[in-house]
Each structure stands twice: as C-alpha cells, then as structure tokens.
C-alpha cells in the first residue's frame, strides 16, 4: 500500500529541536526560514504491508514498510553544502530528521486505521530485526521513487525501513513506540 503523509513540526517541536540538536534560541529565525524553504520540497510517503509474510518475524500481528521524505530534503541539504553553507546544511539535515520522526508517527496511524489494530512497538531494521530483511521488504512494498542500492542503502537518504508490532489493545502513545526514535539517525 502507498500512503501520502504530510509531516510537519508543531510549536512544541521547536523547543525540542533546539535542545536535541544543541542550537541556541537566537538561531530560531534561521531554522524557521530553512524549514519554510524545505517544507514544500518534502514529498513524503509510506509504502507498507500488513501481511504477515516476512521470514524471521514471528509476531502475531505486524506491519512493515518504508517511510521517505522524498528527494527534496536531500537536495536542499546538498545545495547548502555545494555553496559551503555548512550550518544551513546541518540545520536542514536536523529538520529532516524531525520531519522523518513525525512521518513515522503518521505511518503508524495509517497502519492502525488499515489493520484495525494498535501500534505498540516500532522497530528499525538493524535494531531488533536483521538488515537482511531490507530487500524482501523493498520487493513486497514496491516503492516508487525509492531505490535500493547494491550495498542495501536506501535512496533518498531520508528513508527508513520499519516493522510495527500490532495488538488489539492500545498500550502506548504513538510518540512512545520506539526508544530509539529520539536518537535515530543522529
């Protein structure tokens, strides 16, 4: 399945952004300007399956898929780097990580709606499940606009493979599904 998602940052996210990435509050105007430039470039999608057909995953109910911000976030960071604007490139990368975290939440909500179950745990390949599942996931969800390189790297760079454990009972707030979510890709 393919699901359009629209990640964005809330007012609460701005405070978290500054503390998480060690920016002083006086950088917020620059950060917001880069965010304003980036947001129209983000073309985010989740490609996923709720079939229980991955080898080596023994959960009773789960979904798996790929979440991407599209090429725009990568291109903006690269544009800044090409012009030797390192701080701006770093800010763009940090913003895209926050947007990707928000996209994971939206992916989990889409899975909940499709499956009529609750997302109770979100895992990234390489954490609890082997990276060797990536080609299988890629083949099953057939993501247009995402490429898997010969070295099992996903392009665009702001793309992640996830497995969501599902249950009939809600156990956690979606923001609490993954212990590594606050550390991911840093």
Regions found by a protein language model. Give the residues of each.
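Immediate flanking context of iron-sulfur cluster ligation sites
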Residues: 125, 160-178
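Conserved mixed alpha/beta catalytic, RNA-binding, or beta-rich assembly cores of soluble enzyme
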Residues: 59-127
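Conserved small/polar residues in nucleotide/adenosyl-binding loops
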Residues: 184-186
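Active-site helix-to-loop segments that bind/position phosphate- or nucleotide-bearing substrates
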Residues: 1-88
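Extended, compositionally biased
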Residues: 116-162
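Conserved active-site and cofactor/substrate-binding residues in soluble primary-metabolism enzymes
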Residues: 29, 33, 95-98, 102, ...
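Hydrophobic, well-ordered secondary-structure segments
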Residues: 104, 108, 134, 175-178
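A residue-level signal for conserved active-site and pocket-lining positions in enzyme catalytic cores
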Residues: 181
